Amino acid sequence: MLDVMKHRAPDDSGIIDDGKFAMGMGRLKILDLDSPNLCPVTDGELVMTYNGEIYNYLELREELTQLGHEFSTESDSEVLLKAYRQWGDLCLDRLNGMFAFAIYDGHQIFLARDLAGEKPLYYRKRAFAFASERKALEGCIEFPPGHYGTYDLQTGHLTLKRWWFPPTKIRGLSLEDAVKELDVLLNSAVQMRTRAHVPYGLYFSGGIDSTLISTYHSFEHRYTYQEKDYKEEFLKVFPKILYHLDLPTTHFSPFGYWKLAEEANKEVKVVLSGEGADELFGGYVRYVPNEFNRQAQQHFPSYKGIFPYTDMMWDEFNGNLRTLLRIGDRMAGAWGLENRCPFLDRRIIEFALALPIEYKIKGFETKIILKELIKKRLPNYEIKEKEGFYVKVNEWIGSKDGFGKTDYMRLQKQLCKKS
């Protein structure tokens, strides 16, 4: 299992087996580069496998030290294990980070995943096992984001519980105050995500999201997808991309993220990106009222549209965003990189979900609060039409009559057969 996933954790690996249960872990070294014996992490009683980063590990370490805990490494993984020992499952509410981890105490296994699903986790009920990628575990299902679970070795029963709940009330604050608060939160999120003992960079498209991130930190390394005719390379490497994705995709973006990660791999081990901004702050064109809604609102002022914006965004957060996170994680992992997303800081997620909808979308205007924030930080910034990392797959394969999702899926099947 570890060998199949070695690409995402190339620096170290190890296995602990007590005869009842075995746990293995690979490591991509980001913090505390010199400490040995961190795969898996153990204190002699608890054993932990862990994928991710706890961004507020320094603050938690200080709190745990005051509670009497001693540390032998500078790693966030040791902080996480001691946080679990101190607070049990309640430690999850103290974590600011992306994570999927499992802790074994000789009798049961505790598993948990971050609230947005940034880090992957899959499990199999029959002959219980878990892994970070589907390819390592036949017959597995996805562990839900924002949940924890306890597997009892004696009974063979797994209990799942939600540990994170979205805010249910809309806050009453002015747009000006909201912009100020987001400014502070985003600054903190970026600073925490640049805590690393290795070089790091930024996926930079020039759009609002990545440009905002760049205003809070001076990034020596920036990576932008270059639009070229990649037809031959696309056809050659796409089977590899599908292998790392584990599943077919209707998105054209994986090749773009593959190229970005390939370039970033030459210089850094960590990249920041703008995932989550569109889903949380209303960045998609489909949020803009269509002509039917526009006419209906003119004639019937009380008409609010067929689909409430808030419900649409929540569906995006739980649907499209998870797909994009899977793509970003797998393409970065394929090149031994770690992808970090400041907009998916827990504080920003909860802030965004509690914002009045008119601070995100109003009429035909999208991402209102982000546009106000970038005006504040970069007064001369020219807001451009959203592009992202656009990959022209339909043009490369010579389709004159359009290239739909069905054609794309058929192409993937053909490429996999040839590889």
Residue ranges, per PLM feature:
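Short Ser/Thr-interspersed hydrophobic loop/turn segments at strand-loop and sheet-helix junctions
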Residues: 24-35, 101, 115, 264, ...
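Short hydrophobic "helix-edge" motifs at membrane interfaces and signal-peptide entry regions
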Residues: 107-108, 196-198, 264-265, 329, ...
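Short acidic/histidine-rich active-site segments
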Residues: 268-278, 282-284
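Conserved glycosyltransferase catalytic-site signature
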Residues: 76-77, 96-98, 253-258, 278, ...
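Adenosyl-5′-phosphate
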Residues: 140, 155, 253, 270-272, ...
